[in-house]
């Protein structure tokens, strides 16, 4: 009798723990963030294809898409383009692009996007016409409010000198932000010196004309939009009725996947204090943007890692980044077939690398673990909604 009672107590404890775990998982807000980096978007493209493939296997659903699993998907520059590709609906109200379509997109269109050089020394390197053309063909008239999940795509308005963040949750207060996804994607990719700034107009709630004069989102978020995406997730948790149980969101309730486009390991070794002591404006101008972006990306990752670790939730945050790019793979606009093949290899090899020196788990293993959390959470919410 005592033995039977003990077994029943043990079973109850296991069920209670499991129920609590799934309840906590069901209340989590999931965030995907994708860095900028031009043609180097092939690297996160490889990672996203692997992740979506794992989700399809786990849920036995070949039609499963990343937008089904993430509450917020944010990106800047090429990351903004990927965000639009996996969240913009087709005629069946499903993402018009699967993750496996990303790399072929770069191979098909990259050489044309980065080939229309204006030939002007005092102007942008590329005219941007092909980029705008392909965005209009792929995204059509689709606007922000139609995105299949919350998005966070950044740009910078050079007329108002302020960042512009395109999200669904901002539309009630700022309906002028309900722009075409094609305009948004060009704007977030319009890196100064590479592409011309983008002008377009929408309407306010009063019907007045609202003008945008936008450049690359990296000017606003410096290439890594992870913190921006988290802030949008926080706002959604506070305002969306679907998340009423987690109004006071903290990082313990966040599941964050941040994808980089690679950094140059040799860059830190390129210059010394002695070498740069007599540099003037021209020399610094050639390298300061790369320095600033690298430093900002590092600090964003450092801040997020520290916060999640302090909350004993380090498994809730995964930064996937290649820190050893060399040669042509460091260039954002080298869309030669040879270089794109190298970038594919970088992405595939990255999956086999350890997450860090202190964590022998490979990125592939970490992404499988992440996929399991995403899958379990989706199932929990689906079961809860059926009652």
Curated annotation (Swiss-Prot):
One of its GO terms (biological process) is defense response. Pfam families: Patatin (PF01734). It is found in: Vacuole. PROSITE patterns: PNPLA. It comes from the Eukaryota. A motif (GXSXG) lies at residues 75-79. Tuber. Residues 32-230 form the PNPLA domain. Keywords: Glycoprotein, Hydrolase, Lipid degradation, Lipid metabolism, Plant defense, Signal, Storage protein, Vacuole. SUPFAM superfamilies: FabD/lysophospholipase-like (SSF52151). Its EC number is 3.1.1.-. The active site is at residues 77, 216. InterPro entries: Acyl_Trfase/lysoPLipase (IPR016035), PNPLA_dom (IPR002641). Gene3D superfamilies: Cytosolic phospholipase A2 catalytic domain. Its main location: other. One of its GO terms (molecular function) is nutrient reservoir activity. Glycans are attached at residues 115, 203. A motif (GXGXXG) lies at residues 36-41. Belongs to the patatin family. Probable lipolytic acyl hydrolase (LAH), an activity which is thought to be involved in the response of tubers to pathogens. The nitrogen atoms of the two glycine residues in the GGXR motif define the oxyanion hole, and stabilize the oxyanion that forms during the nucleophilic attack by the catalytic serine during substrate cleavage. Patatin have a dual role as a somatic storage protein and as an enzyme involved in host resistance. This is Patatin-05. The gene is pat1-k1.
């Amino acid at each position: 009798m005592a033995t039977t009672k003990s077994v029943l107590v043990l079973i109850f404890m296991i069920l209670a723990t499991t129920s609590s775990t799934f309840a906590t998982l069901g209340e989590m807000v999931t965030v995907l963030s994708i860095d900028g980096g031009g043609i180097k978007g092939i690297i996160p493209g490889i990672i996203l294809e692997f992740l979506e493939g794992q989700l399809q296997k786990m849920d036995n659903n070949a039609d499963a898409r990343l937008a089904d699993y993430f509450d917020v998907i944010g990106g800047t520059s090429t990351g903004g383009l990927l965000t639009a590709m996996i969240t913009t609906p087709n005629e069946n109200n499903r993402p018009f692009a699967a993750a496996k379509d990303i790399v072929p997109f770069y191979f098909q269109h990259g050489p044309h996007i980065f080939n229309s050089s204006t030939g002007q020394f005092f102007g942008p390197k590329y005219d941007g016409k092909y980029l705008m053309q392909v965005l209009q063909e792929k995204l059509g008239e689709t606007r922000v409010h139609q995105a299949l999940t919350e998005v966070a795509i950044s740009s910078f308005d050079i007329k108002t000198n302020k960042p512009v963040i395109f999200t669904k949750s901002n539309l009630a207060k700022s309906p002028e932000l309900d722009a075409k996804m094609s305009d948004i994607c060009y704007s977030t990719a319009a890196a100064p010196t590479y592409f011309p700034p983008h002008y377009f107009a929408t309407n306010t709630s009063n019907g007045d004309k609202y003008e945008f004069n936008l450049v690359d989102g990296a000017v606003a978020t410096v290439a890594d939009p992870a913190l921006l995406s988290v802030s949008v997730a926080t706002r959604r948790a506070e305002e969306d009725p679907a998340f009423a149980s987690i109004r006071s969101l903290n990082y313990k309730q966040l599941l964050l996947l941040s994808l980089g486009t690679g950094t140059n390991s040799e860059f830190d070794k390129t210059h010394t204090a002695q070498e740069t002591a007599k540099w003037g404006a021209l020399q610094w101008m050639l390298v300061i943007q790369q320095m600033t972006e690298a430093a900002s990306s590092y600090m964003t990752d450092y801040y997020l890692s520290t916060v999640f670790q302090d909350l004993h939730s380090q498994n809730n945050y995964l930064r996937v980044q290649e820190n050893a790019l060399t040669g042509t793979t460091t260039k954002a606009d080298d869309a030669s077939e040879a270089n794109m093949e190298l970038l594919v290899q970088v992405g595939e090899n990255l999956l086999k690398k350890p997450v860090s020196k202190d964590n022998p788990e490979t990125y592939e293993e970490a992404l499988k673990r992440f996929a399991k959390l995403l899958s379990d959470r989706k199932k929990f919410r689906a079961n809860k909604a059926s009652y």
